[in-house]
Amino acid sequence: MHVKKGDTVQVMSGKDKGKQGVILKAMPSKNRVVVEGVNVMKKHAKPSQANPQGGILEIEAPIHVSNVMPLDPKTGKPTRVGFKVVDGKKVRVAKSGESLDK
């Protein structure tokens, strides 16, 4: 996958097109990611030990990884991801040449 947990991304298509957020969870086996504040669904929860009140919760549902693009650290715009080998490690690189991995 071209994105990882903690990356700042922009949604490129769907009902939340244009929104930006941080990836909270990545699911490579399903090709899906959960982005903060994107694809928010309402879930009905029964009262439990963790949530004694119960009620309606708003949670982020996963979206397909093809619908998001990471933001370039240099320009702040969505960018495609390339890969380079630096010191024997495969590193993700934005098209501007800036490294996406910390």
Curated annotation (Swiss-Prot):
The keyword rRNA-binding applies. InterPro entries: KOW, Rib_uL2_dom2, Ribosomal_uL24, Ribosomal_uL24_CS, Ribosomal_uL24_KOW, Translation_prot_SH3-like_sf. Keywords: Ribonucleoprotein, Ribosomal protein, RNA-binding, rRNA-binding. One of its GO terms (biological process) is translation. GO terms for molecular function: rRNA binding; structural constituent of ribosome. GO terms for cellular component: ribonucleoprotein complex; ribosome. It comes from the Bacteria. Transmembrane segments: none annotated. Residues 1-22 are annotated as: Disordered. Belongs to the universal ribosomal protein uL24 family. One of two assembly initiator proteins, it binds directly to the 5'-end of the 23S rRNA, where it nucleates assembly of the 50S subunit. Part of the 50S ribosomal subunit. NCBIfam families: rplX_bact. HAMAP family: Ribosomal_uL24_B. This is Large ribosomal subunit protein uL24. It comes from Exiguobacterium sp. (strain ATCC BAA-1283 / AT1b).
